A protein has these predicted regions:
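Membrane-proximal intracellular helices of multi-pass ion channels
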Residues: 1-477
């Protein structure tokens, strides 16, 4: 080993403890906000948030004490450890208000619901959402907004005070294959992205209130939409309002949240043309448009919807599937069966890199498709030099290899999860759809766990397996 190389290969435990400790204090501040919401509505659930704050700050304080003397450095390995343990700890403490209050009396169900929130999956075990207090409903939606914030939350809330570790944790949370050299420093970029995230949330809140939602419902649904999570304050989800205006607003903001946020930054810099020149953006919009058009025709000619309703329902469901959001306005189990395959394709594809959406990401699909195309060309022209290009940039062989490895890993997770769920008694279709939904952080599945049903009927073992897949999703997709 060269000098220091052995030490550099080790995990910086004290630095990890410090970051996790600070993040737990930030989560406590979020709990305090939810307690204030409960007090505003005259509800007693505020006390359960206070109990959780005490436990949270106690553990956070212990972690900070254990971090004394930490070296001011973070490696990529440290970054992945922080991201993974943050999801787990936030979920572990985030479930406590649900459990303490009796709103979700089962540890398994409370953990599942909270993990689904922080990973922006949107699958729920609740059969009577409206029975929860306003404070718990607000916390439920806030978990998604925090989870959707992802990279921006970690970067601007914690890392600037730790100096050189920013890049490493950024790369553990960020998703992309290239870095534009025209972009500013990562911490500056993160602040701009946070502003964009907040602006989208506020803009949608205003529009939903114009459409007839209360302020509370509008805020909660805006949290879920911009995070592409899908938690609603109503059991019937967005269909509760039966409002075309609200459906169009949410559909549009789901699509906006599925676009690479750095492209919005370029637009703010006066480089709006970059948006329409971006290969991934065009791929994403073409996919949304084609799927919406095909499903619209299917609903008109096979389900006898009128044209406007067919287009609206198709657009909404394609948007929610393609951006891994969990909202629903229709039971697509009643649609033509071939449309299920189209929606599953949208679930697998996900949104753009650098967005709040889950799924495989369109960038990876583009690289895979273009590499396959080149391989077929090489069969005819063995000596041809055929680089894979994205946005006119040549993608390195190492990135292509990592994309291929990712797909193998992804398929392995689907197969393993599918087999395990069937072992515990879940049906073939339901097992496949819930595994794909959890791994892609999508939300509703098919069959008995479609948009019209909760996931409460799943065996406890299946819920723990799916919770683990939800956690793998945001970590592996990076």
């Amino acid at each position: 080993y060269k000098g220091g190389s052995r030490n550099n290969s080790l995990i910086n435990k004290k630095m990890i403890f410090r970051v996790l400790g600070v993040l737990l204090f930030i989560e406590s501040a979020m709990f305090l906000l939810c307690a204030a919401v409960s007090l505003c509505y005259g509800e007693q659930d505020y006390q359960y948030f206070l109990y959780t704050i005490l436990l949270n700050t106690l553990v956070g304080g212990v972690l900070l004490i254990c971090s004394r003397g930490a070296e001011n450095r973070l490696t990529r390995r440290d970054g992945y450890c922080i991201v993974t343990f943050t999801w787990f700890l936030f979920t572990l403490f985030g479930m406590l208000p649900f459990y303490f209050s009796g709103g979700i009396p089962s540890v398994t169900d409370a953990f599942f619901e909270t993990m689904s929130g922080f990973t922006t999956t949107g699958a729920t075990i609740l059969d009577d959402i409206e029975s929860l207090s306003h404070g718990l409903l607000f916390w439920r939606s806030l978990t998604q907004w925090i989870g959707g914030l992802g990279i921006v939350f970690f970067t601007i809330a914690v890392l600037p005070i730790f100096g050189g570790g920013t890049i490493q944790l950024f790369s553990a949370e960020a998703i992309g294959v290239t870095h534009d050299k025209t972009h500013p420093r990562i911490d500056v970029m993160a602040k701009w992205l946070w502003m964009i995230y907040a602006i989208l949330t506020i803009a949608e809140t205003v529009l939903l209130m114009i459409g007839g939602m209360s302020f509370f419902d509008a805020v909660c649904h805006s949290f879920s939409t911009t995070a592409t999570g899908g938690y609603s304050t109503k059991q019937a989800s967005v269909a509760y309002w039966n409002s075309p205006f609200i459906e169009y607003v949410i559909a549009i903001f789901m699509i906006l949240s599925g676009i690479n946020f750095s492209l919005y930054f370029m637009c703010l810099k006066g480089k709006g043309k970059r948006l329409f020149q971006d290969d991934e953006f065009r791929w994403f919009m073409k996919s949304v448009s084609i799927l919406t058009l095909v499903i619209t025709f299917a609903l008109v000619f096979q389900n006898h919807y009128d044209w406007e309703k067919a287009f609206r329902r198709a657009l909404f469901q394609v948007a929610t599937a393609h951006t891994s959001c969990g909202f629903a306005t229709d039971d697509y189990n009643l649609w033509p069966s071939f449309t299920w395959m189209l929606l599953i394709f949208a679930m697998l594809s996900g949104g753009c890199t650098g967005s709040t959406s889950g799924g495989i990401k369109n960038m990876r699909l583009m690289i895979l498709a273009r590499n396959i195309k080149n391989e077929f060309k090489r069969m005819l022209h063995p000596r041809a030099v055929l680089p894979v290009r994205v946005n006119r940039q040549v993608i390195s062989p190492s990135i292509i290899a990592s994309v291929n490895t990712f797909f193998v890993f992804y398929l392995f997770c689907i197969l393993a999860g599918w087999i395990l769920l069937m072992f515990f008694g879940v049906g073939i279709i339901e097992a496949m759809s819930t595994v794909i939904s959890s791994l892609g952080n999508v939300g509703p599945g098919l069959g008995a766990f479609g948009p019209a049903f909760s996931w409460a009927a799943l065996p406890d073992a299946a819920k723990w397996i799916l919770s683990f897949l939800m956690l793998i999703g945001p970590v592996s997709y990076t």
